Amino acid sequence: MPHITLESHLPGITGLLEYRKETGAPIRDLTQILLRGPSTLTEAERELLATVVSHGNQCKFCTTAHAATVDLLLGESETSLKVKQDISTAPVSEKMKALLTIAALTGKGGRLVTTEIIEKAKAEGATDLEIHDTVLIAALFSLYNRYVDGMATAMPDNESYFNILADRLVNHGYSRLPQGYDHLKKQNTKP
């Protein structure tokens, strides 16, 4: 049960972002820029960064939401599963393994990211901007993870919620839906 009164049809982060829209808006804007804006990293790669950080922070809601989004973007579920199990053997490029490692370490603590780890990423072809955005995505999702779990937000009643949420994130991004979310009160599967 959440520590404060939130809309029951909006589990996880959406309920928090709707609770205080004036703080939710800049968080959504930053997320939209980082995960859907122009980048040399694909949307799936950026969602993988969010997944690995959320998994490392043991945030079930965020891990499940972003793994489902990766799965939808890639059309398969093996990659997100393998990344959560062991980055070093995941079916991604060496550059992506290096960036995922940076993200995972940032999620645990920024000072764990060493010059050696950054140099390895650069040797695998990572640009300064990709490294910058990786660290910022990891820091942002650490905020999300602590926000969701620190407020004890509810998990959805139905696991299919995450497939609907993934579809919304893939097709509409992270911006607030123009009509809001009241329409979700009428659905049995609450996204």
Sequence positions of predicted segments:
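Hydrophobic alpha-helical segments
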Residues: M1-P191
